[in-house]
Amino acid sequence: MSYPQEVNKRRTFAIISHPDAGKTTITEKVLLYGNAIQTAGSVKGKGSSAHAKSDWMEMEKQRGISITTSVMQFPYNNCLVNLLDTPGHEDFSEDTYRTLTAVDSCLMVIDSAKGVEERTIKLMEVTRLRDTPILTFMNKLDRDIRDPMELLDEVESVLKIRCAPITWPIGCGKLFKGVYHIAKDETYLYQSGQGSTIQEVRIVKGLSSPELDAAVGDDLANQLREELELVQGASNEFDHEAFINGELTPVFFGTALGNFGVDHFLDGLTEWAPKPQARQTDVRTVESSEEKFSGFVFKIQANMDPKHRDRVAFMRVVSGKYEKGMKLKHVRIGKDVVISDALTFMAGDRSHAEEAYAGDIIGLHNHGTIQIGDTFTQGEVMKFTGIPNFAPELFRRIRLKDPLKQKQLLKGLVQLSEEGAVQVFRPLMNNDLIVGAVGVLQFDVVVSRLKTEYNVEAIYEAVNVATARWVECCDAKKFEEFKRKNEQNLALDGGDNLTYIAPTMVNLNLAQERYPDINFFKTREH
């Protein structure tokens, strides 16, 4: 197959949702339809031995939430689909944000009983920054749901995106009979397929077919016809250009748990979602059709293999083709490296990649030299932009139970900070280690990973820090004066960047007024 054909058949997407809207179940069912796993293990919390394929870290297994981002690749409809699983738990916005910089489209999953929830709103704001095309799946139709028209109205008014229903539900809860495909004029009748059973779906042609009345009952058939008249009068028709621009979302209805409707949005994804898209660098735009290799690292994950203390850098291939043993330039450090053992992923199962094309995600073994945001090319000096680091909102001091393990603690924290799991600050005035996070759960993750991966018993406690800002100044003399007078509020982060840590917001505001020449940054590029 030629290079353009390989690139054009790739679809790279992520699933975004509020916690518990069914994202992990959908992830599994997508893999099931892509024949990537044989049995979809229902995700359980503590104590269950059936863990979802994409939740592999110890703490995730205990809590039944996907904390880290995994990558899964599977074939579907002559396409090769890369699914990036993002953490659904409300605490993990940074990792999720960075993952969304590596995809070309997203599937938004909504719990049809609850509608649009707060976490979905946040994630949609992120996709808005790059106008990412969005498909929508209204999930849990095997339960009692809100009125479907109401759900569409809510998506339109709250998320500011037009909805184009592709399928429409017939009943819900115990009376759920299936969905009607508006463009194809076909009804797909629901039969629950549990676990890994994909039922043969019976299809009824035509909305006026008496077979439809016989299958779902006169009342529901008539209700469907009435609702569709309303829908066709009130909602938008699918418009591909508006979808690609992130202005309109095709909407599908179904139940992931019942293995129903998942294939409908997969058909939509492979047919309509964009092929690998261009990406901005500091010098030019890189198109996916270019045959020279380039890619950027959007995530680093430690210990994917419990047997080895390894770290894997996840790289999105932007252009060209990766081949085993090829020489690439690691732009930030200006070194050429030979990559002979890149990985491809089926979550938890890693296999060595012989080749990968634009749109694919590959894993590079990392012994501490690769950082989030790093660019790799075949020689060209450029840096992909738009992968941010956020100033944390929550802070804790980390304390050792055994003071002799200070060295291991520091090593563990620096590695976790390079991975983007947490940010570490070392105050200039004392030996404290302060960690900053975007969500509370991250502190638990850090303590649990320090224990399992670095054999360090640590606890965290409150610390008098309200917020942090990275500080820079063009005038060296003024910067020195600022540093001298504010030493008690200054710290170095994991990458040795100078940071102002403020005990209160008032303190920060005063410092900014007092030193107008100093730049205080809330985010910085990786």
UniProtKB/Swiss-Prot annotation:
GO terms under cellular component: cytosol
Cross-referenced Pfam families: EF-G_D2 (PF22042), GTP_EFTU (PF00009), RF3_C (PF16658)
GO BP, sorted A to Z: regulation of translational termination
Location relative to the cell: Cytoplasm
GO molecular function, one term: guanosine tetraphosphate binding
CDD domains: RF3 (cd04169), RF3_II (cd03689), RF3_III (cd16259)
Keyword flag Protein biosynthesis: yes
Keyword Cytoplasm: yes
Binding site for GTP: 17-24, 85-89, 139-142
Keywords: Cytoplasm, GTP-binding, Nucleotide-binding, Protein biosynthesis
Domain annotation tr-type G: ranges: 8-277
UniProt similarity note: Belongs to the TRAFAC class translation factor GTPase superfamily. Classic translation factor GTPase family. PrfC subfamily.
Physiological role: Increases the formation of ribosomal termination complexes and stimulates activities of RF-1 and RF-2. It binds guanine nucleotides and has strong preference for UGA stop codons. It may interact directly with the ribosome. The stimulation of RF-1 and RF-2 is significantly reduced by GTP and GDP, but not by GMP.
Protein name: Peptide chain release factor 3
Species per Swiss-Prot/TrEMBL record: Actinobacillus pleuropneumoniae serotype 7 (strain AP76)
Phylogenetic classification of the source organism: Bacteria, Pseudomonadati, Pseudomonadota, Gammaproteobacteria, Pasteurellales
GN (gene name): prfC
